[in-house]
């Protein structure tokens, strides 16, 4: 079963791991999780365009080009719970469709290398913009792949990613509101 652990060997033993960091910023968008007592949270920058030292893309797809990969994998553990969250950051939520493809494609390829002893989640965050008309279609795709309460997008709460990891439902109206005037 050595091949089952290989993705985590790549993540842990390469520049993919962001040691001691629970904050990540790409362009204008960022995410942060404040660890609580008893939690282990690891951030992995897996996008080889922003982190050329991470070889996860080559492991998952070899020399095949054009595959969509998300920005981060966040590993969360507390007591016996293990969560692997696939995270994509966008400057504008109009890119929600592309972000949805990135997290789903990364998850579907990644899960083929692991035993299902974890909960998979997805988080897509954009710092600006109104939800695209097709957002319900993307929501259905995420629901199909990750299940109810295992994904969130455009939730602008400061602790939205931490809440998702901990299983705390989104605050009322978060991620659903229109631009205020």
Question: Residue spans of the language-model regions?
Answer:
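Charge-rich, low-complexity N-terminal segments
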Residues: 1-52
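Catalytic cores of nucleic-acid endonucleases
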Residues: 94-130
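Short, glycine/serine-rich, charged loops/turns that create anion-binding
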Residues: 79, 91, 129
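Active-site metal-binding core of divalent-cation-utilizing nuclease and nuclease-like domains
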Residues: 31-79
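Flexible, charged surface loops at secondary-structure boundaries
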Residues: 78-81, 116-117
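Domain-level recognition of nuclease-like catalytic cores that cleave nucleotide substrates
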Residues: 2-13, 120-181
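Conserved catalytic cores of phosphodiester-cleaving nucleases, focusing on short active-site segments
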Residues: 72-74, 83-91
